[in-house]
Amino acid sequence: MILVGLTGGIGSGKSTVINYFKELGVNCYQADKEAKKLMDSDQDLIRKIQNSFGDNIYINSKLDRKKLASIVFNNKEKLDLLNSLVHPAVNNHFISYCIGLKDVYIIKEVAIIFETKTQDKFDKIILVKAPKEKRINRIINRDKCNRQDAIDRINNQIDDEDKVDESDYIIENINIIDIPKKVLKIHKNILNSIKIH
């Protein structure tokens, strides 16, 4: 099975792209979504988060995401700490998820493939890019945060231009109408590359 990483900066439109791959029948694992679930359900992970960020980071057994975001997105050390707790749990979950799969290829959506230097774990990488202003607006609308918070979140990640050379496919997410065609082209290309080998 070919493992394809799908990545891109916050607000680039990775979920939109993933949904088009799903429509083509591609098995997609969304690491960020699974991480959110695990932070509310994995007792070992919950304990580690509480030990690192305080018991009051959970209210009625639910993670106070807004409070956690205000801590980690303005502090790289705290963000790195959170990632060091969450990523092993997500990786273990992904390994379990893959057991028994018969898919020709699977996409694992991971926002920070390059930031965590895990690009070598993937056979192919798809990078989703979008203009900074579009990303800022998406983050503000989605996360109900202010403009500066959105900019800080973007600045906590490696610039997209630095990811281009190590990516096999680039999707410029400027006009949503173009996305299905771009996704289909990449899908066919991946399938063809598998047939060749």
Which sequence ranges carry the predicted segments?
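ATP-dependent small-molecule kinase phosphotransfer cores
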Residues: 33-102
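A general structural signal for well-ordered alpha-helical segments in protein cores
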Residues: 3, 18, 35, 46, ...
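Walker A (P-loop) phosphate-binding motif
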Residues: 1-33
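ATP-dependent NMP and nucleoside kinases share a basic, alpha-helical "lid"
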Residues: 92-100, 105-138
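Well-ordered beta-strand positions
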Residues: 27, 33, 124, 168-169
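Short, structured coil segments at secondary-structure junctions
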Residues: 24, 53, 121-122, 166
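Residue-level signal for inorganic ion chemistry
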Residues: 13, 32, 82, 107, ...
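Small-molecule kinase domains that catalyze NTP-dependent phosphoryl transfer to phosphate-bearing small molecules
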Residues: 94, 102, 120-121, 132, ...
